[in-house]
Amino acid sequence: MSGLFITFEGPEGAGKTTVLQEMKEILSAEGLPVTATREPGGIDIAEQIREVILNKNNTLMDAKTEALLYAAARRQHLAEKVQPALKEGRIVLCDRFIDSSLAYQGYARGLGIDEVLSINQFAIGDTMPDVTIYFSIEPEEGLKRITSNDSREKNRLDLEALHFHTKVREGYQKVMQRFPERFHTIDASKKKELVIQDALQVINEALKKIQL
C-alpha cells in the first residue's frame, strides 16, 4: 500500500507553511496517518544544510552552489524521511520540494530549469509529488506579509529584492506549464480560513483516488 506525497509550493509570504500545519491537524484528527515535513530540512543533516543556505551572512554564495546544496539536502531528506513514510502508506505533506529549486534557482537565478531539473533528478530518482498545491500571491503582498510578521526571522531569500521575487513567480508559472497534471493553484491572498478550505478540498479529492 503506497502513501500519498503532497507538496506545498509558493513564493515567500504566501502562507503555505501555516496551512500545511492546519492540514496536518485536520487529517490527523480524522485518523489518517500523516507526516508533515519541510525543505530544506526535515531531518538533522538537511537542517544543517538549511542553516548554510539561508544564513543571511552568506551573501557570496554562488547560484550553482545554492542549487547543489538544495539538491543534497533533498536527497538526504527523501531517503531518510519521505520515502520510508510513503512505504508505510502515510500521507506526506512537504513544505517545498523540487519545484522550488526549478523556480528559484532554475528561473530566478538564471541557471536554467532543465539544468536544475537534471541535478534534482539525480537526487530524487523517480520520486515525484502526487499532488502539488501552489499558493498564488503577488510578490508585493508576499513581501509585505514578511515585513509585517515580527515573529518571522528574516532569511537570505526573504531579503532579496522585489525583482527576484517577481522572477520566482514567473518561474513557478513555467514549472506549472511543464507539470500541469499535478498542480492545483490556490488564491493565497484570500482569508486564511478560505485558503485552508481550498487546500483541504484538493487533498480530499486526491484521497478519493487512492486507498489508505
Curated annotation (Swiss-Prot):
Enzyme Commission number, as recorded: 2.7.4.9
GO annotation terms (biological process): dTDP biosynthetic process; dTTP biosynthetic process; dUDP biosynthetic process
GO molecular function: ATP binding; dTMP kinase activity
Catalytic activity: dTMP + ATP = dTDP + ADP
Keyword ATP-binding (UniProt): yes
The UniProt record lists the keyword Nucleotide-binding: yes
Keyword terms of this UniProt record: ATP-binding, Kinase, Nucleotide biosynthesis, Nucleotide-binding, Transferase
Transmembrane portions of the chain: none
InterPro entries: P-loop_NTPase, Thymidylate_kin-like_dom, Thymidylate_kin_CS, Thymidylate_kinase
Functional description taken from the UniProt entry: Phosphorylation of dTMP to form dTDP in both de novo and salvage pathways of dTTP synthesis.
NCBIfam families: DTMP_kinase
Name of the molecule in the record: Thymidylate kinase
Organism: Bacillus velezensis (strain DSM 23117 / BGSC 10A6 / LMG 26770 / FZB42)
